[in-house]
UniProtKB/Swiss-Prot annotation:
GO biological process, one term: alkaloid metabolic process
Chain sites annotated for binding Zn(2+) 2: 101, 104, 107, 115
UniProt feature coiled coil, ranges: none
Swiss-Prot/TrEMBL cofactor(s): Zn(2+)
One Pfam family, short name: ADH_zinc_N
Protein name: Alcohol dehydrogenase 1
Organism the protein comes from: Petunia hybrida
Cellular localization per UniProt: Cytoplasm
Note accompanying the cofactor annotation: Binds 2 Zn(2+) ions per subunit.
Binding site for Zn(2+) 1: 49, 51, 71, 179
Amino acid sequence: MSSNTAGQVIRCKAAVAWEAGKPLVIEEVEVAPPQKMEVRLKILFTSLCHTDVYFWEAKGQTPLFPRIFGHEAGGIVESVGEGVTDLKPGDHVLPVFTGECQQCRHCKSEESNMCDLLRINTDRGVMIHDGQTRFSKDGKPIYHFVGTSTFSEYTVCHSGCVTKIDPQAPLDKVCVLSCGISTGLGATLNVAKPTKGSTVAIFGLGAVGLAAAEGARIAGASRIIGVDLNPSRFNDAKKFGVTEFVNPKDHGDKPVQQVIAEMTDGGVDRSVECTGNVNAMISAFECVHDGWGVAVLVGVPNKDDAFKTHPMNLLNERTLKGTFFGNYKPKSDIPSVVDKYMKKELELEKFITHQVPFSEINKAFDYMLKGESIRCMITMEH
């Protein structure tokens, strides 16, 4: 596939957020060519993640508008900028909100995926190379979001945030691996590492929590206990391997960690916290068994949050860990997660509960705000 648009400005449709909390507007925008170490992508499928909604609502952070949101997507490389050697036009790719420069100490460490250059930055609305946007309308800039901005038919990303995948993989399924599903799956498989036959508690049964449960199912956990305040999520969660449910509301003043300890003869082997609520974090840590229990924090807290637990909980040989994007390095590791799906070791279809055409993207926001969807697939109408 040779690109006849390379080096030129592309006019295309994008869903622009003009102000906080207001419906997105489909506009014709201009997308500039990729600069040094950048790639321009044709987006084919994108899905809505709660992080998009959070920054669109702009309740807890500095608002930056107009902006093009979106960061879970699949597409095809349209053209590449100077210096890009590992990607070419026609490659099937997933853009990722965090990156891998492959040069820094984090990228060279086998333990970390938190690239110094390209790790997530929710405040930055411009490209790293020159501090400019690649999107504009009527000569005025439209800001980027987490380096991806996939609610546009074309977008420009840093090449370190673009993962080349098996061209046989269906982009309308594997695109969910570019954020939430990998975050939960990797939190379990790469960080909690439950053994076959073990017990695992998952706090929060949204997309990330269900992906964490899927990880526990793949690992062969014998009991997967789902904890959520919304009982309507319990039925769905069974498809992801969850065997038992705890709704904290059903237990009065009894702390959920005590409820779980009583269910499991002293505590679970592993827990994964996916809500970002500090009380849930304490419960997730204190519900693991002494001697070997490991709790993993995934959910993102509010700015001023802090939690406390007695140091004896740690001295009694419990471990508390944190993780970011499931400890996956985007370029090095995500292709193998796609391969897991292709080998039928990982199920993705069950995460995709709704589908809408790009022109109806605001419906995806409605489904998520009402708590009806796990993932809503948005199909571009090129």
